[in-house]
Amino acid sequence: MVSYLTTEMKAGELRSRRSAMLLLSQESCVTLKRRGDLKEERDRGYIHIYTGTGKGKTTAAIGLAIRALGAGKRVLFAQFMKTADFSEHRLLKTLDGLDLLTFGKPFFIASEDHREGAAQIDAQPVFFFAKGEPPSFYREWVKDGLREVEERLQGYALIVLDEILVALSFGLTTEEEIVALLQKTKVGQDILLTGRNASSGLIALADVVTEMVERKHYYRQGVRARVGIDE
């Protein structure tokens, strides 16, 4: 009796396994049928956003650019709101397949006390302006940068607009201008936007959104930016 029950139980287990195998087989067939569609989706190109208060947005963008280069793809890396004094420029401008553009100097600061005009801070040129009223020449720099990127879109698999979201949050460009550029990209082109304060409209439009969150940073203890680590 015990032997009979054991045999029946084993037979039941076998039937269950066969049913599971049949189901997996059917799912595999569906997967194979869809593989072509998935490949088309994979290769169509996507909009990425790296945002948030945490460190690492530009660093991650550089990593993505290097990965693209390693796969034999061409990269257009456009930096807004930055000068060419950052350490990574020494390497990026030497990489075959990557074109580096820099738009954005001198630095500027939104002043709460209505202080305006040019100044020097740590031997760097700085332009103060009233909060909510960014200098018109800086708007033109950003607009010229977006125009140059648009003119050079052809032939790149990855386009990086580094710190363009900061430019947007300062009122140096508009969401409409950025969307107009996104609409000019072709099938197979990925475009990455970086910077703090990503707008809700661009987040809704993007396919991949990554937010860097600062939990702790030594600059809050008075440690200044370190060459080779922070700049």
Predicted region positions:
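Low-acidity, Ser/Thr- and Arg-rich intrinsically disordered low-complexity segments
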Residues: 3, 16-19
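Short, charged beta->alpha transition segments
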Residues: 35-36, 145-155
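Extreme N-terminal basic, low-complexity initiation segments
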Residues: 2-9
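Glycine-rich phosphate-binding loops of nucleotide-dependent enzymes
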Residues: 160
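Conserved P-loop
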Residues: 46-150
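Extreme N-terminal, non-catalytic leader segments
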Residues: 23-46
